[in-house]
Amino acid sequence: TRAAILFPQGSMANSPTQPVTDTTRGKFGPFDGQMLVGEMNRARIMRVLVDEVAGETQGACLPFIDNGGLHRGMHRFVFAPDGSLWVGQTHLSWAGGNGLQRITWTGKTPMSLSRMKLTRIGFLLTFTKPLAKVAAENFIFQRYYYKYHQGYGSPQLGREPVMVTALKLSDNGKSVSIDLAKLNPGYVYQLDLKNITAADKTPVLNTLICYTLNRLTNGNNTAPHLIAGSP
């Protein structure tokens, strides 16, 4: 079974830790119901955007909090009744740190990607705030894949840029539909947001998004490049 969501080694994470779902009903911010994942090697918490496509769970990951006073070694998470997130850190005789930290929502909505949905020919991106005017050069896509094998690890293979062929901003300004020149199963589609701001001039909080595409909307999940011995 292919991984539903891959965390690219190095750029996104090195050692992901406990996943925890935000069940605070808005007490922790605008991402209720989404999953957070820790990271041992750097001061980062990641957020997961689940996408159900033709009966299969796949989706994207992106940084949620980078640094911002966090310590490394985030290994355990629990939400308190007041909606705050307690983070336990350890080094386990390895990378990481020690500590116990509490994260609370400031009450201000950050400018960030809230949903990423696969479409027939690209992606539908939804943000927490209306976007300022956008163009194709604001959305830099590339794709790559990893060996699907029994051995430990894999380099990124088949890395190539993917051209944006069309985009359309929704009437409320929060969503943008993006068409891509290449859309195939078995790849991680990496999106780097360049100079994206909200209409109120708030800069986007995190700019790196990695979507694991296992299945297209028509149900096709054929990925011969993942099979051992294929070119």
Tell where the protein language model's regions lie, with residue ranges.
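Beta-propeller domains with acidic blade repeats across secreted/periplasmic ectodomains
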Residues: 1-110, 122, 133
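Surface-exposed loop and edge beta-strand positions of immunoglobulin-like domains
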Residues: 38, 179-181
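Acidic surface patches and DE-rich sequence motifs
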Residues: 80, 170, 198
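Acidic, Ser/Thr/Gly/Pro-rich low-complexity segments and short DxT(G/T)-type signature motifs
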Residues: 106-115, 132, 156, 184, ...
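Blade-terminus and WD-like Trp-Asp/Gly-His loop motifs, strongest in beta-propeller folds
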Residues: 117, 168-172
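Structural beta-strand segments of beta-rich domains
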Residues: 121-125, 176
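Short, surface-exposed alpha-helix to beta-strand junction/turn motifs within ectodomains of secreted
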Residues: 125-166, 191-198, 207-211
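Surface-exposed, short loops/turns at beta-strand junctions within beta-sandwich domains
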Residues: 181-187
